[in-house]
Every structure is written in C-alpha cells, then in structure tokens.
Amino acid sequence: GIRDSSVTGVQTCALPISDLTARQLQKLMCEKLGLDFASSVVNKTGGGSSLSYVYLNQHPGDAHYIALSLQPMITGPMMIAGQIPHTEMTPLAHLFNEYVGFAVRADSGIKSGRDFVERLRKDPGAVSISLSTALAGSNHLATVLALKTAGVDIKKLRVVVVAGANESIAGVMGGHVDVMVTSAASQIAHIQGGKLRGIAVSGPRRLSGAFADVPTWKEQGYDSIYANWRGVVGPKGMSAAQIAYWDDVFSRLTQTPEWRNEALRLLQDPVYMNSAETRRFLDAQQQELRAVLVELGLAK
C-alpha cells in the first residue's frame, strides 16, 4: 500500500513557485502528517508542463505517482495536438489560487483599471500590454477575460509577450510598454518602492500588504475573476480507494497552519477542493477557456 511504499511527486514546469509547492507538499506530508513513506520530487519540465503528464500516465492506476497541475493542462490540449487532456488523468486536489496584477509606471497617465478599459473600448490598440510568458498563458487569459467582460474587442489588443515578470517590469519602468500583467506577488517590491502603481487585481477580493489599495475588477464595475490555480493530479485509472486516500491526505495537509501561512505570505488564496470538486472545476475551466481561445483564433 501507499503507507509503506514510496511516492514520486512530479514537478511540472521550471517555475520557482512550482518547485516550492512540490517540495513543501513533500515536507508537510512527512513532518506534519507523519506519513511513513519515502518520497521524491522529480522535475519533468518543458512543453507547457505536458511532459510531466506523459510521464505520469506511464504509470496508470499507480497512486504512488502524482503531479502538480496548472492551467496549461487545460489549454495545452486545445492548442497542440497530442497533449494529454485532463480527462485522461485523475484529478486529486485543488490547492490554491494565485491572482494576477495589472500595473503601470507610477507616473503613468492611466490612473485606474477603469481608465485602462475606457481607452481600450475607444481603441483596442491604444495601450500596449506586456505579459509573460505566452499567449493563452494565465496572464494573457486574465487580461482577455477581464477586457472581454468590459466590452473591449480582444482580437485587436496590442500585446507584447516577454520571457518573464522581470522583463515586463523593465518594459513598463523603461516606458516601452504601458501596462504590465504578471502575478501580483512579482509586483510587490516595486509597488512598495513607489516605482509601479497597481490598477487592478483579478481576484474576488483585494489582496493584502502592498495590494491593499489596489481594487479588484469587480470593484471597478467589471464582473471578472481569474485565478492562476495549482492542484494535484494522478495518472489515469486510479481506484476509488486510492482517490479516497489522497483526498484524506490533501484535506488534512491544506488545513495545517504551515500550509496556510506560507500561502498567505506568497499572496496565494488557499482554496482546497477534493477530487470530485476538482474534476467539476476543471471541466468548467475547459468550457470557459475554450470559448475565449476560439474567439482569439488560438484554438479550434
């Protein structure tokens, strides 16, 4: 059984937050839940996390293999033939949400999220938007879903895709682009330092700390919420007993103060869902995101 065996956790992409999450899960399982199995974290990077799911499904029905799940698990198969859809894996948990921040240079003439939207409603190409790391990635989706809700023609946006948050920050600070869209956490130091000014956040409520004064889209009149979520999946073919085992593990792990405090420190929203709830969530994500990607011509 799992209790007296070894577990392999697959880290899905070369992002610091993913590696931190995988290793924190490993640490808490051993130290706080007292689970008596050996565990290891294996990095299977590349292909928008698709390689990790190929590796995972080489072990069908084996509950000793689990992987972090991210939004590209949903959008990747819509855009790239041959990627494994989420329906071919076993959803095990939704762990937390990470919200997206919209920011401008401190002296920008764009004063608010509403100001940003109104400029784009008049002319969708009037404002340059820097986002990482790819079209159909979380920052792009947070942008187009909010602007679509606001009545902007999202097919005509002037989007600049860069390699990472640091490049977005440099572009805005240097005056090369008008608005940057990245994880809220990556903007904190520059907002605190007075170099950037937040104009909107994609969450259901305001964030803490440096983002306490940054309103949500909903506060500014646009009914849009977007989360860059993290979860856990297992391979296809897991049994009800195996799923129940991991439901118990993750429900207990996500209630520990260590898990919740670390999430809040990183501006993450520790929203836990069990296997059945996660499956319904992923199905709903697939429908919502397919519609906007088809509109953009990025999926069929």
Features from the language model and the residues they span:
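An extracytoplasmic/periplasmic, membrane-proximal ligand-sensing/linker region
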Residues: 240-300
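C-terminal lobe and pocket-closing loops
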Residues: 186-255, 284-287
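Hinge/capping helix and adjacent helix->loop/strand transition within the periplasmic-binding protein
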Residues: 28-36, 55-64, 77-167, 217, ...
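Short coil/turn segments
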Residues: 14-16, 71, 105-110, 132-137, ...
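A ligand-binding cleft/hinge motif common to bilobed small-molecule-binding domains
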Residues: 68-81, 144-151, 178-212
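Short, well-ordered junction/capping motifs at the entry into regular secondary structure
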Residues: 1-5
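N-terminal (or domain-start) structured segment
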Residues: 6-88, 126, 135, 152-178, ...
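Stable alpha-helical elements in mature extracytoplasmic
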Residues: 17-21, 25, 48-52, 71, ...
